[in-house]
Amino acid sequence: EINQLYRTLLQDVPGIAFHTNPNEDFDSNYWLTCIVVNADVTGFTREEVRLRMEQENIETRPLWKPMHLQPVFADCPYYGDNTEGRLFDDGLCLPSGPALTNEDIARVATIIKEMY
């Protein structure tokens, strides 16, 4: 319900993409709503969105930092194409708690839209 409302409110916002199921074999419960901010399209970065939300006393966070980028794993081999690095750089977890109201979600969406 939370995820769907975010998707509805931000569906026409250029440069904001939501994580989706890759195909019908997957069925996410969307316990956490995450977006990817394409700064080339939006004109602002994920970090700018996070800081703007912080100014409004709204907690968001980047997607999880990839294991191979954490200091404890600095000397470990890495096999990949940096997709996870791009998601960490551009991805943001939006407020998704069960106590959120529709008005709370609308406020988050409005703040993102006002950044344009």
Regions found by a protein language model. Give the residues of each.
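PLP-dependent aminotransferase class I/II
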Residues: 1-116
